Amino acid sequence: MPKYRSATTTHGRNMAGARALWRATGMTDSDFGKPIIAVVNSFTQFVPGHVHLRDLGKLVAEQIEASGGVAKEFNTIAVDDGIAMGHGGMLYSLPSRELIADSVEYMVNAHCADAMVCISNCDKITPGMLMASLRLNIPVIFVSGGPMEAGKTKLSDKIIKLDLVDAMIQGADPKVSDDQSNQVERSACPTCGSCSGMFTANSMNCLTEALGLSQPGNGSLLATHADRKQLFLNAGKRIVELTKRYYEQNDESALPRNIASKAAFENAMTLDIAMGGSTNTVLHLLAAAQEAEIDFTMSDIDKLSRKVPQLCKVAPSTQKYHMEDVHRAGGVLGILGELDRAGLLNCNVKNVLGLTLPQTLEQYDITVTQDEAVKKMFRAGPAGIRTTQAFSQDCRWDSLDDDRSAGCIRSLEYAYSKDGGLAVLYGNFAENGCIVKTAGVDDSILKFTGPAKVYESQDDAVEAILGGKVVEGDVVVIRYEGPKGGPGMQEMLYPTSFLKSMGLGKACALITDGRFSGGTSGLSIGHVSPEAASGGTIALIEDGDTIAIDIPNRSIQLQLNEAEIAARREAQEARGDKAWTPKNRQRQVSFALRAYASLATSADKGAVRDKSKLGG
């Protein structure tokens, strides 16, 4: 029988000092012996996805205490990728994932907590907490802050839905008036919550649901809706049950590594491909799998991407549907239900509620459930009122969207495309692979060949795009922006948005060893591995070289013979200490970022730290 970890600090005469300090936090004699559960919050006023979380940690803590546990709350950092976008701040986004994972490990192990409730929401916070959870392998439940309501405004006598990306595109489009740009900016992000499309934050919160580590509805139920409160109350109660199951009944099925098994990871990636999730999810699932000691690689993702269709299309891939519409159509379990009927899921998995996948689908798939409370929950909709308050409204759709032929979520028969929403490409400058969000690529450019325009920083590429130096047919290559080369693997949302602003969204391709925001669409290929700074062939591409992209055949090729590539590699190596570094880039890199770069692996490894350099 496992011993409560917290007993290390609460039992025995030699722990009198620790108990004295615990008493100073409010604990009493009756608390010593109860499970100590960490409430891992991420409240900050910097991030709309987290601005409403201050009181939610207290809500969970109160439920833990009422259920027989002792709750202790702490916060992690949280970077807003949208605010950090387009300047040096973006260098810090991906590295913050490792800091979050480490900080959770530090706090939980230093104080010997028995279990955790992780209150996350945005881009690197959910992945960081997920990595920590699988590293620590103690009982955990995730409950996120929830999606933002979609922005809405009237343009050309028509009400349209908006998000952050629309504001960026309109702001950079010289054809758009100042008044219209201002109108869109003020309408794009109306409430607290993670940005309203299938961007990285919402993608990851959907994937924690598919992994079994969060409750039904977690990925899609709006931040503002009163129904979401129940997820937090349930999490506080359920984590105590999970904790006692493990420590008092020796039930290892309560542990996250047994819930988020390899089968669960495959199901999560299948969901991601079917819903056209953010390409960043590939990085994060690879990283989380390594923490769980699961053999889950780019090869597994490639195999899944070749057989899973696209069953859901959401902003930024379409303006018609946002997360509020996904929820109305049944949320994550609506998509999983269709994937199950298509025979594409492994049903031998359980979730934090203790339900198998078939049991969960029977209760929560809106096309089959008989539970009226579940149907009511999935009718939770937006209020259209600007607010930063959680649970502030109780509006509901008049009906569910259960139309699987023409609705937001489709059945296999009526799939948006037979190919899924993500694809892995390989070629002679992406030997270890690269990623494209096919859900956002127009059919007319699934095959694309053009001359390279090479830039060694995102800033230079943006200047060239806005300056008219990139023209129809070009393949924009942005390199030395990988995990090591950036360092920090910046998102390229501004270059892709500005290509659209200049009317080139369907006329150019963009390739990078950096990454893309979940808000990116278009022929945008990222995560090229190995990256330039690690000796990747992308560092050898020159202006005018022809690059051929063939998404249907999963191919990306630099059309040069091997002898020329070898000659360029030899010339690069001859640069000595300057080899595999940008020639003319001026960038101030802090010590903290240099430390990150010294251990960073390429994207095909999840951009995690290279354990071999630490002797592990």
Curated annotation (Swiss-Prot):
GO cellular component: cytosol
GO annotation (BP), single: isoleucine biosynthetic process
Modification type N6-carboxylysine: residues: K124
Organism domain of life: Bacteria
Pfam families: ILV_EDD_C, ILVD_EDD_N
One GO MF term: magnesium ion binding
Cystine connections: none
Pathway: Amino-acid biosynthesis; L-isoleucine biosynthesis; L-isoleucine from 2-oxobutanoate: step 3/4; Amino-acid biosynthesis; L-valine biosynthesis; L-valine from pyruvate: step 3/4
Annotated positions binding [2Fe-2S] cluster: C122, C195
Necessary cofactors: [2Fe-2S] cluster; Mg(2+)
Ranges in a coiled coil: none
HAMAP family xrefs: IlvD
Function of the molecule: Functions in the biosynthesis of branched-chain amino acids. Catalyzes the dehydration of (2R,3R)-2,3-dihydroxy-3-methylpentanoate (2,3-dihydroxy-3-methylvalerate) into 2-oxo-3-methylpentanoate (2-oxo-3-methylvalerate) and of (2R)-2,3-dihydroxy-3-methylbutanoate (2,3-dihydroxyisovalerate) into 2-oxo-3-methylbutanoate (2-oxoisovalerate), the penultimate precursor to L-isoleucine and L-valine, respectively.
Active site (catalytic residues): S517 (proton acceptor)
NCBIfam families linked: ilvD, PRK12448.1
Cofactor, free-text remark: Binds 1 [2Fe-2S] cluster per subunit. This cluster acts as a Lewis acid cofactor.
Catalytic activity: (2R)-2,3-dihydroxy-3-methylbutanoate = 3-methyl-2-oxobutanoate + H2O; (2R,3R)-2,3-dihydroxy-3-methylpentanoate = (S)-3-methyl-2-oxopentanoate + H2O
Organism: Salmonella gallinarum (strain 287/91 / NCTC 13346)
Quaternary structure and partners: Homodimer.
InterPro entries for the chain: Dihydro-acid_dehy_C, DihydroxyA_deHydtase, DiOHA_6PGluconate_deHydtase_CS, ILV_EDD_C, ILV_EDD_N, IlvD/EDD_N
Protein's UniProt name: Dihydroxy-acid dehydratase
